[in-house]
């Protein structure tokens, strides 16, 4: 190791996808589903090398015979044994590195419980023996990746949506708002409205088909009522989708009805404000002096902000809520699916960041609670 720079590893553990790679790269090397699958039936064919669990793409491809579980729910780790399997898979199978040789930067959801950060830190140092470790808030990293230090980030992934106002590189905790409504809920919502058409998707494997339909065909309407009217009069928006068994299904107004729930959570039976209203509420919780800069730097991040039409709709809704003379600007970078990871890659390769790592030695002296003093 003498004098040679060792690349840090950056791992963004999302509720739906895990993004991993090396600091300094401009995109993650490995992107795979954050899921662990276990066989539903006893293996009977000897010599097939059946495993008791599968992770990521392998679990995805064998989903027909597995029960799939996501260890991260609503952005927060709920099953540590499965989480450890995912990290093990990330290091050894995806990146093919020895974790004891590389500093590791992990990401976490805003307002992550303290005990979770400690557990993360403990597993990294004790199970994987990493030499150095750091944990960073996802939304802050997204803002870095857009080249800003001030702005408000709407980060919506598979498990949770957050609105995080950030000023001069620090998140403003009193303004952080969270909505437990994200990609996974939209997938469930879509499968519910598809069942009204007589298409039923019930197993955890079939749920993945609905996710694919959502990612390929859904979009956000600029004016929902208008779009509903148009779609009832013409079949212009109808699209067909071929299922794995060759059956072709047709989907129409479901294309924009599913993502509409982001703006109207009541559609899902949730008593929450939509992403537009929540962004506005978050700005209003911040000091008057910073609001103008927040309105002018609304940054979208995460896979659930990838729907066509979402930025235009957001611009329209926020402009209607904001003071009339206010300049509202929505920034929706094309790579926003990975912007958290990209921000982590930037951060971990800064020369000024190198003294920020928690070292193995510091961990051995202070224990897991050191994470609260060094990472904020």
From Swiss-Prot:
<dbReference type="InterPro" id="IPR004000">
    <property type="entry name" value="Actin"/>
</dbReference>
<dbReference type="InterPro" id="IPR043129">
    <property type="entry name" value="ATPase_NBD"/>
</dbReference>
<keyword id="KW-0378">Hydrolase</keyword>
<dbReference type="GO" id="GO:0016787">
    <property type="term" value="F:hydrolase activity"/>
</dbReference>
<dbReference type="Pfam" id="PF00022">
    <property type="entry name" value="Actin"/>
</dbReference>
<protein>
    <recommendedName>
        <fullName>Actin</fullName>
        <ecNumber>3.6.4.-</ecNumber>
    </recommendedName>
</protein>
<comment type="function">
    <text>Actins are highly conserved proteins that are involved in various types of cell motility and are ubiquitously expressed in all eukaryotic cells.</text>
</comment>
<keyword id="KW-0206">Cytoskeleton</keyword>
<keyword id="KW-0963">Cytoplasm</keyword>
<dbReference type="GO" id="GO:0005524">
    <property type="term" value="F:ATP binding"/>
</dbReference>
<dbReference type="GO" id="GO:0005737">
    <property type="term" value="C:cytoplasm"/>
</dbReference>
<comment type="similarity">
    <text>Belongs to the actin family.</text>
</comment>
<keyword id="KW-0067">ATP-binding</keyword>
<dbReference type="InterPro" id="IPR004001">
    <property type="entry name" value="Actin_CS"/>
</dbReference>
<keyword id="KW-0547">Nucleotide-binding</keyword>
<dbReference type="GO" id="GO:0005856">
    <property type="term" value="C:cytoskeleton"/>
</dbReference>
<dbReference type="InterPro" id="IPR020902">
    <property type="entry name" value="Actin/actin-like_CS"/>
</dbReference>
């Amino acid at each position: 190791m003498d004098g040679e720079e060792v690349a840090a590893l950056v791992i963004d553990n999302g509720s739906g996808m895990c993004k991993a790679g090396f600091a300094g790269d401009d995109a993650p090397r490995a992107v795979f589903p954050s899921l662990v699958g276990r066989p539903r039936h006893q293996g009977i064919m000897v010599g097939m090398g059946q495993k008791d669990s599968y992770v990521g793409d392998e679990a995805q491809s064998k989903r027909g015979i597995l029960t799939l579980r996501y260890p991260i729910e609503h952005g927060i780790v709920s099953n540590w044994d499965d989480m450890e399997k995912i990290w093990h898979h990330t290091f050894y199978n995806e990146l093919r590195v020895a974790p004891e040789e590389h500093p590791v930067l992990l990401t976490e959801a805003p307002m992550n419980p303290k005990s979770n950060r400690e557990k993360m830190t403990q597993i990294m140092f004790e199970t994987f023996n990493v030499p150095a470790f750091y944990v960073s808030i996802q939304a802050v990293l997204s803002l870095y990746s857009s080249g800003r230090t001030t702005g408000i980030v709407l980060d919506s992934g598979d498990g949770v949506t957050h609105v995080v106002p950030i000023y001069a590189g620090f998140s403003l905790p009193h303004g952080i708002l969270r909505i437990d409504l994200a990609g996974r809920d939209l997938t469930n919502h879509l499968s519910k409205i598809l069942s009204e058409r007589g298409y039923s998707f019930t197993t955890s494997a079939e749920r993945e088909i609905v996710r694919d339909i959502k990612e390929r065909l859904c979009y956000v309407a600029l004016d929902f009522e208008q779009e509903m009217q148009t779609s009832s009069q013409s079949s212009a928006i109808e699209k067909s989708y071929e299922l794995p068994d060759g059956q072709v299904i047709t989907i129409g107004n479901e294309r924009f009805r599913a993502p509409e729930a982001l703006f109207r959570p009541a559609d899902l039976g949730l008593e929450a404000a939509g992403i537009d209203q929540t962004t506005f509420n978050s700005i209003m919780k911040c000091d008057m002096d910073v609001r103008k800069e927040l309105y002018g730097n609304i940054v979208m991040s995460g896979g659930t902000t990838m729907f066509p039409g979402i930025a235009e709709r957001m611009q329209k809704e926020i402009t209607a809520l904001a003071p009339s003379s206010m300049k509202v600007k929505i920034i929706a970078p094309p790579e926003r699916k990975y912007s958290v990871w990209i921000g982590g890659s930037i951060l971990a390769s800064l020369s000024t960041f190198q003294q920020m790592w928690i070292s193995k030695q510091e961990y051995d002296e202070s224990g897991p609670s050191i994470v609260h003093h060094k990472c904020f």
